[in-house]
Amino acid sequence: MQGQAKRDYPGSFLHQATWYREHAALEAKLSRLGLLISQGMPVCRTLVLHPVESLWYQIHPGWVNGLNAAEPAMKRLERQFRQLFHWLMQTQTDFDYGDEGILATHAAVDAAQPAALRVGQMRYRRVVICGCTCIRASTLQLLRSFSAAGGELVWIGTPPRYIAGEAFSECASLAAAGIRLPLRKSDVLRYFRAQPQSVRIMDDNAAAEIYLQMRQTDDCIFAFLWNKSMSRTLHDVPVRIPDGLYAELWDCRDGAVYALPVRNDCVSVSLAPGAVRTVRLCREQRALPPLPIPPQTEPVFLRSPAGFRLNEPNVLPLDRAALWLDEELLCAQDEILKLDRTLRGRLGMEQRSGEMLQPWARKGPDTSYPIRLCFSVLCEQLPQTPLLLALEDLPAQTLTVNGMAISLCKAAGFWVDSCFSLYALPAACWKLGENQIEWTAAYSEVCGLEAAYLLGDVGVWFRSGTPVIGCLPQTLKIGNLVYQGLPFYSGKVRYLFDVPADQKFWLQLDAFGGSCTAAACGGERTVFWGSDPIPLHSDAARTLELELILNRRNTFGPLHRFPRKQPYIAPDSFTCDDASRYCLYPTGLLCAPKVYFEESICFGGIQR
């Protein structure tokens, strides 16, 4: 993570990530899903002609602005492309995109009824043309042959007007013999929902949120249902299946398999936000346990944690400083990465960027220059224990806090990455109000100015938008940790809740800020994502440990980039015009956990 590496993308999947130990649970789940979704052959009968060649015909200087189209015609093509994808998926119509180059080489019409367009091992009975302004002559001939054999052509919107870049009207006459639909959501949904499907979502309201894919093997069909909504839980969605088949639910989280009851050729499936359900349809009924479901009782809300634990010290990033070059003040106060650019510009050095030459590839002598950095830290409560200062890249020559010399012997311990050196700052060196941390170092082209990090058993509180050192909170409330003394903390937070002893119950989280969660109640620790309820069993200890695994965003940034959600994060995202305002992600338990007890009990003075 040294220097620019902490702003590289994608980020590290190694021990620097708070969630790296929990990542195995996610990989196991996705590996099971990946294995199942590769079985047999796709149940896919629709081919959508990809309009990429219509885009290439319109390419010219200035057609694009960064990653976005700049021309109205290009924007319209991109919009239509997105719209058609979502409309088809909302009707549970699985499809493949057809590239005209691949079709010219590998596609052929199979006239045996029902007619099919054969591409490799796939056989398509329907071809959809939407958004194409120009197609190849070979594509037009293929579509004409497919239509003549009885294949279904669906033309959405305006048919192509150009063939190989020249104006032709043949597409319009071919479209007149096919199915014409306006480029309107209601018409597209109505048509495709009316088409026969072996598996169908019977609730149109829920169907708009569910994407479906199926795989056919020799003895079964696997149906994969994904709730694309990240905020809406879909309860008891009726799914119609072929007559005479039995249903099984395969849980990719732990590999368990359960029987799903079939009533009137329908199964009932519930989907938490973002959840995937894998349903196996087969002709032989197996002896399987029933799917465990939470009891249909009123939930108990856990609103008051009995305590909490942190697995790392709290942290305050120091990313604004004053800079001196050989006793000349270059800048009285600025963001640290801007100071680095200022210093490199003054010294005639190449700026650090994603295209910079790696330090170990440089040749020749490396001249160094004496610099001094000063960070200001506000303190409203004096620390009771020593703090640690994490520095990187620049070996300190001298280090002082409020004029008190600090030993340059590195303190024992480790924090996040080996690039950080830790220095102990005695509690006696701090004072109420403003504190000054200064260090001198030798700067060279292979170095870089980076933020420092203050670590310890202290709280960090915002006063008029400025972070101030105070007391670490004694308890945590349900809500955003940013406003509870832990705004920049990025380790793990373990919430402790009192629960009745020796009880079976289900735990559900509707909203949290972090990467994932883990729960234990005296037994095995369960890692989970999303808001799917999980079963637990309390022991005699009567304590539910709910651990929230955060990510490093609020520690390493970008800390000042507005708005919070960006289309992408790159090295340039870490500098901005106003580094005095912080833009942090909400972390912690953002709403009270819900518990569903399987037996009637008295909990918190209330009969459940």
Model-assigned labels for residue ranges:
Residues 151, 491, 509, 515-516:
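Glycine-centered small-residue hotspots that permit tight backbone geometry or close packing
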Residues 372-374, 494-498, 505-507, 514, ...:
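Active-site-adjacent substrate/metal-binding segments within catalytic domains
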Residues 392-396, 510-512, 549:
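Solvent-exposed strand-to-loop "edge" motifs in beta-rich extracellular domains
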Residues 403, 509-511, 522:
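Short, small-residue-rich loop/turn micro-motifs
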